[in-house]
Swiss-Prot record:
GO terms for cellular component: nucleus; RNA polymerase II, core complex. The lineage of its organism: Eukaryota, Fungi, Dikarya, Ascomycota, Saccharomycotina. GO terms for biological process: nucleosome assembly; poly(A)+ mRNA export from nucleus; regulation of transcription by RNA polymerase II; regulation of transcription elongation by RNA polymerase II. Residues 1-12, 62-71 have a biased composition (Polar residues). Transcription factor involved in RNA polymerase II transcription regulation. May function in both SPT15/TBP post-recruitment and recruitment steps of transcription. This is Transcription factor IWS1. Its main location: nucleus. It comes from the Eukaryota. InterPro entries: RNAPII_TF_IWS1, TFIIS/LEDGF_dom_sf, TFIIS_N.
Amino acid sequence: MSGSSSVHSGTAASEEWGMPSVGEIGAAGEAVETNEVERAQHQERQRKHIATSDNDEEESGNKWSVSTLPITSYGGDGDAAGGSGRRQALEAKMERLLKKPKARHSRQDEEDLEQYLDEKILRLKDEMNMAAQKDIETLNRRLETGDNRLIAMEKVTLLPKVISVLNKANLADTILDNNLLQSVRIWLEPLPDGSLPSFEIQKSLFAAIENLPIKTEHLKESGLGKVVIFYTKSKRVEHKLARLADRLVAEWTRPIIGASDNYRDKRVLKMDFDVEKHRKKAALDSAKSKKRRKAAVDEEKHKSLYELAAAKRNRAAAPAQTTTDYKYAPVSNISNVQTGIRTAGVGSTLNNNDLYKRLNSRLAKSKRSK
């Protein structure tokens, strides 16, 4: 009875002085403990969500499971130091979970990636060949039917995809190994009607070819070198593209002839320079040039007005009649032949000509008939 009376008296005193009772203190402790547990569980659920989102890039052996971690409960013993230590331990565990482990790629993954890239390049190669074949068929139909509405647009439509693949540096070896340059050669070849491909196709493909590490074996396998040489010699190719083709040919032929691209290894031909010989040659050339100029001036002086006018109009003119004087008479080297023909007088041999006799007889007959 005394104990109960003391409890009641304590409760009454606490109520009187505004102090919390023992029951209220216990309830408050349980509420604090519940809040701490709920907050820890909420943090663990967030970490579990983060861990599951990163599972695609991690191996199965390195996966972390939040559910396996023990949940630290906080008691209502009022020990602040112990509570802070457990909280720090939980935070340390969560920091370890947040650290993303390095992804380890196995050899099998690398082989799968190479196989995927090879298949991608081979599919693009087939698409390029089909597009070129369709354009050729379209041009052949246009030549046969004469219908100018038939336009070959397959290669132009596929061009952006081709250029995007050719410009990727990480695909350079795959492109060369799968002989995609053969399809590039087909695209650059002249069309059945003798015309060249679209200028956009020429410009884009030559720019992409320039960035590829093409070697001699790749040129032999694809046949691209012949088409590039054609572009260096054709007069229908744009000037900048022709110069780019010349540069590519020079770069590709350098390892074939054993030439180095280092300027220090460049061989410069040298020869001795004779100053006196150069002066004599220059004087002789100047004398010849003066003689030619003088002859040209004399020729202009002797031309008639008609010839000068024709020369100004860049026309041909009939040569003017001139009188030629000879200082020395030619000497005959033909021996005198003794004949029975009378050589005295001008036209003395006409009477001995049979043709002349026949003409005279005809003239005489015509006079008699009159």
